[in-house]
Design a protein with these regions (language model features):
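Conserved N-terminal subdomain of the carbohydrate kinase-like
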Residues: 48, 52-126
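Glycine-rich phosphate/adenosyl-contacting loop at the front of the ribokinase-like
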Residues: 1-74, 110-115
Length: 126
C-alpha cells in the first residue's frame, strides 16, 4: 500500500523571519512536525507515504494538510477536529544559537488522536 506511514505531530512552527525597527521579532508561520518533514523527504526520493495525525479544523490545520498534499503525501489519516486547535510552536535561538521551543497547546490537536481514529484510517495492517 505505502512504503512508509508515519504517526505523530503536525504543528505550525513560528520562527523569527526578521526584526522590526524596535528590535521585536517578526514571526513567520511554517509547517512543522518531524513526522511530516520526514515523509516529505521520503516522498521526494520516490517513496509512497501517508500520515496519521490530528490537527485543528482551523486555518493552520488546513495549511498543514494542504502542504502535505502538495508534496504527494496521502492525508486520509489526518483527522481535523473542531474542538481543539492546531498546536503552535514558537522557535527562538538562545545566545549560543541553539533552538528553544515554546508550545501553545491546551490541549493541542496533535495530542488528541485516538487509537480508533488511527486504525479507522485503514492505513495500518494488523
Amino acid at each position: 500500500m505505502f512504503d512508509v506511514v508515519a504517526l505523530g505531530e503536525l504543528l505550525i512552527d513560528f520562527t523569527c523571519a526578521s526584526k522590526d525597527e524596535a528590535g521585536y521579532p517578526t514571526l513567520a508561520a511554517n509547517p512543522g512536525g518531524a513526522p511530516g518533514n520526514f515523509l516529505a523527504a521520503l516522498q521526494a526520493y520516490g517513496c509512497t507515504t501517508a500520515m496519521l495525525g490530528k490537527v485543528g479544523a482551523d486555518a493552520f490545520g488546513k495549511l498543514l494538510v494542504g502542504t502535505l498534499e502538495s508534496r504527494g503525501i496521502d492525508t486520509r489519516g489526518i483527522v481535523m477536529d473542531s474542538d481543539v486547535f492546531t498546536t503552535l510552536a514558537f522557535v527562538t535561538l538562545d545566545d549560543t544559537g541553539n533552538r528553544e521551543f515554546s508550545f501553545a497547546r491546551k490541549p493541542g490537536a496533535d495530542t488528541r488522536l485516538t487509537e480508533a481514529e488511527a486504525l479507522d484510517a485503514g492505513l495500518i495492517d494488523d
